[in-house]
Amino acid sequence: MSQVIYITAHPLDEMVSNSMAVGKAFIESYQESHPDDEVIHIDLFKDEVPEIDADVFSGWGKLQNGETLTEVEQHKVSRLTEIVDQFVSADKYVIATPMWNLSFPPAVKRYFDAVSVAGKSFKYTSEGPQGLLTDKTALHIQSRGGFYSEGPAAEVEMGDRYIRTIFSFLGVPKYKLIAVEGHNKVPERAEEIKLNAIQQAESFAKEF
């Protein structure tokens, strides 16, 4: 049995959001073809993912020195530990995001900051950082109103570029993007674009 972490990063549901609609279709198809696998849903607009702030840095320092943490420090540090432990124990990752201002909602960066932990998801070596998640697989479902797969616009697409890079940094060897793109550029084809992406997602789910 495999464990899948399904991460969503949109404040609206699948009735409005293309990334959420395609993500939902993927997960439903995946569960149908992998009935014994466990899917854990993380909603980055609802679930608590602490910022790495002054409390966290203070708490980490106190842990190293054997000092007592404040209640706030303990809560944030413990929650961050739960998040990274959950992340590294999973076998597969699915993340559905919209493109916001060439990138993604800030909650996505906060989550990857939480799970990028030396000694857990990567390690430092004499040759530089080395990812530890070498037996994992990742899928990114990204909705973007324009066309960013090729041409000049591809150079300014920072969302999938970052997610692909951070998964590689953490050692994940298998990565795929399903892009739902162009629905704002050619609104008359918006429904067709979404349905094509849903079909692609449902098909890929069977082999994921």
Curated annotation (Swiss-Prot):
Cofactor: FMN
Record keywords: Flavoprotein, FMN, NAD, Oxidoreductase
Protein EC: 1.6.5.-, 1.7.1.17
Domain of life of the organism encoding this protein: Bacteria
Keyword GTP-binding: no
Pfam families referenced in this protein's UniProt entry, alphabetically: Flavodoxin_2 (PF02525)
InterPro entries: Flavodoxin_fold, Flavoprotein-like_sf, FMN-dep_NADH:Q_OxRdtase_AzoR1, NADH:quinone_OxRdtase_FMN_depd
GO MF annotations in UniProt: electron transfer activity; FMN binding; oxidoreductase activity, acting on NAD(P)H as acceptor; oxidoreductase activity, acting on NAD(P)H, quinone or similar compound as acceptor
Binding positions for FMN per the UniProt entry: 17-19, 99-102, 143-146
Catalytic reactions of this protein: 2 a quinone + NADH + H(+) = 2 a 1,4-benzosemiquinone + NAD(+); N,N-dimethyl-1,4-phenylenediamine + anthranilate + 2 NAD(+) = 2-(4-dimethylaminophenyl)diazenylbenzoate + 2 NADH + 2 H(+)
Cofactor note: Binds 1 FMN per subunit.
Gene3D superfamilies referenced in this protein's UniProt entry, alphabetically: 3.40.50.360
Top-rank EC class of the record's enzyme: oxidoreductase
Coiled-coil features, chain-numbered ranges: none
Function in brief: Quinone reductase that provides resistance to thiol-specific stress caused by electrophilic quinones. Also exhibits azoreductase activity. Catalyzes the reductive cleavage of the azo bond in aromatic azo compounds to the corresponding amines.
Protein family per UniProt: Belongs to the azoreductase type 1 family.
Assembly description: Homodimer.
Record-given protein name: FMN-dependent NADH:quinone oxidoreductase
Originating organism: Staphylococcus carnosus (strain TM300)
